C-alpha cells in the first residue's frame, strides 16, 4: 500500500473533500484513472466515496480503518451507552408513586440494565474485528469529519461530487445499531417482564417513555454527533453537578449534622450521589486522558469538592430558592 501511495501521489492530484481512490485489482478500464503500478496489476479508481470501513488518507487513497480505538473514543461510546440507561432509570424513578412494592421497582431497574448490556455487547461484537470486545476505527482530527455530506466538493460550481460516507467509522454507525438493538431488547424483555411479573401491578409509562426516547436520541446523534463527541466531558460535568445540587436541594435547608445523617442513612441518597460522583469522575477522566501533562491523574482529587462545598455552604444558602426556579 505504501508503494502504491507513493506512486499515485506522483502522477495524480489529491481528491477534493473526503473523496478517495479505491485500489482496484484486475481490468477496470471504465473506472481506472491512474496508470498501473510497477507490479502491473493494481490500479486506482476515480475519486469517489470510500467503502464502508474505509477512509481517505493523505494521498487520497481509501485505506481500511484498522487502527484500535483510542481511550477517548471508548469513553465517547460509553457516554452514548449511558445516556439511554440513565434516562430510562429516571423514567422508572418518576413512576415510583405508581409502584406497589420496591420489589417491582427493582425488577424493572434490573431489566433496564440487562436491555442496555445486551445492546452494547451485540453492537460491539458485530463490528470489526468481529466477535471480539475490541473495535478498530479511523483516525479523527476535525469535527468536519462527522459531517462529510456538508463538504461534498463542487466542480465548476455546478456539479456536486457525492463523497458521503462514514469518515469516523465506527463511531457514527455503531450508535444507530446500538439504539436499534436497544429498541428490540425493550420490546422483548420489558414486555415479558410486564406480562409475567408486573401484570396489573405497575404503570406502563416508563415503557412507553423508553420506546419514544430512543428514536429521539438517534435523531440527536444524527444531527449533533460531532458536537457531542468533542463536548461530552463537559456535558457530563455540568449535568452531574446540576443533578447533585438539585437532588440535595430537595432536602431543603437543614443543619449540617442532620444533613449528613440523612444522607448516610438513606440508600436512595447514597446510590444517587454515588452515580453523580461516578459521572463527575468520568467527565474529569475524559478531559485529562488526552492531555500529556505530569500528574494529570491528580485532578481526580477535585471530584468530591462540589459535594463538600455544597454541604459547607448550606448555612449560607437557601435551597428552596433552587426548587422554585426549577
UniProtKB/Swiss-Prot annotation:
The record's subcellular location field reads: Endoplasmic reticulum membrane
A GO molecular-function term, please?
ubiquitin protein ligase binding
Tell me the disulfide pairings in this chain.
none
Keyword vocabulary terms for this entry: Endoplasmic reticulum, Glycoprotein, Membrane, Transmembrane, Transmembrane helix, Unfolded protein response
Spans within the Lumenal topological domain: 1-71, 130-166, 291-296
The record ties this protein, via Pfam families, to: JAMP (PF05571)
User: By which gene is this protein encoded?
Assistant: jamp-1
Identify the residue ranges that face the Cytoplasmic compartment according to the record: 93-108, 188-208, 251-269, 318-326
Superkingdom? Eukaryota
Which source organism? Caenorhabditis elegans
User: How is it placed in the membrane, per its record?
Assistant: Multi-pass membrane protein
What are the GO cellular component annotations?
Answer: endoplasmic reticulum membrane
Transmembrane ranges, per UniProt, are 72-92, 109-129, 167-187, 209-229, 230-250, 270-290, 297-317
Q: What is this protein called?
A: JNK1/MAPK8-associated membrane protein homolog
Signal peptide start-end: none
| Biological process (GO), any one | ERAD pathway
Amino acid at each position: 500500500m505504501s508503494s502504491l501511495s507513493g506512486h499515485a501521489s506522483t502522477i495524480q492530484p489529491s481528491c477534493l473533500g473526503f473523496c478517495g481512490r479505491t485500489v482496484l485489482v484486475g481490468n477496470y478500464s471504465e473506472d481506472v484513472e491512474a496508470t498501473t503500478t510497477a507490479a502491473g496489476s493494481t490500479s486506482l479508481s476515480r475519486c469517489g466515496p470510500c467503502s464502508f470501513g474505509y477512509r481517505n488518507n493523505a494521498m487520497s487513497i481509501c485505506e481500511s480503518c484498522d487502527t484500535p480505538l483510542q481511550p477517548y473514543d471508548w469513553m465517547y461510546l460509553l457516554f452514548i451507552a449511558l445516556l439511554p440507561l440513565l434516562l430510562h432509570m429516571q423514567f422508572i424513578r418518576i413512576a415510583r408513586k405508581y409502584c406497589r412494592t420496591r420489589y417491582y421497582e427493582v425488577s424493572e431497574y434490573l431489566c433496564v440494565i440487562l436491555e442496555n448490556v445486551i445492546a452494547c455487547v451485540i453492537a460491539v461484537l458485530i463490528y470489526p474485528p468481529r466477535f471480539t470486545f475490541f473495535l478498530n476505527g479511523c483516525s479523527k482530527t476535525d469535527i468536519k469529519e462527522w459531517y462529510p455530506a456538508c463538504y461534498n466538493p463542487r466542480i465548476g460550481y455546478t456539479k456536486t461530487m457525492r463523497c458521503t460516507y462514514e469518515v469516523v467509522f465506527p463511531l457514527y454507525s455503531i450508535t444507530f445499531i446500538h439504539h436499534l438493538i436497544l429498541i428490540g431488547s425493550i420490546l422483548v424483555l420489558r414486555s415479558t417482564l410486564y406480562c409475567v411479573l408486573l401484570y396489573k401491578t405497575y404503570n406502563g409509562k416508563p415503557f412507553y417513555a423508553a420506546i419514544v426516547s430512543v428514536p429521539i436520541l438517534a435523531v440527536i446523534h444524527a444531527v449533533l454527533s460531532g458536537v457531542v463527541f468533542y463536548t461530552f466531558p463537559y456535558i457530563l460535568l455540568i449535568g452531574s453537578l446540576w443533578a447533585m445540587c438539585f437532588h440535595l436541594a430537595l432536602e431543603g435547608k437543614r443543619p449540617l449534622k442532620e444533613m449528613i445523617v440523612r444522607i448516610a442513612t438513606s440508600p436512595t441518597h447514597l446510590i444517587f450521589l454515588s452515580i453523580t460522583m461516578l459521572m463527575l469522575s468520568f467527565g474529569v477522566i475524559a478531559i485529562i486522558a488526552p492531555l500529556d501533562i505530569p500528574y494529570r491523574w491528580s485532578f481526580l482529587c477535585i471530584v468530591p469538592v462540589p459535594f463538600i462545598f455544597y454541604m459547607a455552604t448550606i448555612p449560607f444558602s437557601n435551597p428552596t430558592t433552587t426548587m422554585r426556579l426549577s
